[in-house]
Amino acid sequence: MSGFGWNQQSGPIAPVLIYPAAGVLLMGLCITFVVETIMGGINTGLNNALTGMGNSSKVILGLVLGGMMAIDMGGPFNKAAYVFGTAAIAAGNNDRMAAVMVGGMTPPCAIALASLLFKDKFTKEEREAGPTNFIMGLAFITEGAIPFAASDPVHVLPSCIVGSAAAGAISMFFNCTLMAPHGGIFVFPVVGNAMMYLVALVVGTLISAILLGVLKKKVA
């Protein structure tokens, strides 16, 4: 009887209290013991690989860091590169952070430029939103490119990755440095070799914008 009574009483509250609480608990356990373990291992592996790469070729490291910033634009690869860059600042390797930031600035700037140069490759809504990405890119907000990448990942992501990788490699080649972990153009006064850093951003942006114009299909 007590079991029956409990079922009758819990019936109305189960959908609004018990089920959500159980779902949150299960999700928390899954994230803690499965997702965090897997992602922690991946991040550790990436960090070790990047550290080892830094001992062999700075330009290749810059290329990889820049490309990682555009692979998922705010996802695990992007964040792994960013964390590596910020940790490098503490270690006195300011050139790593410079490559990371210029790689993250490139995708939004490239999409903004491409939406102006190749209007037939973007929808009306994308053309209207495109110029806003100049501001986001210059402020080092890579996520501004996400809607464009989500709508056409096959063509947008490779274009952005190539340009970001080129920007990161150029930054490292000219020994550009950055002591700030964020800020975009607002921290250019503390960038070492700022002129070539700007060149890296412009070249990376042009490469990605041109690739977007070539690879993207015309909007019907």
What are these regions (language model features)?
Residues M1-V219:
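Pore-lining transmembrane helices
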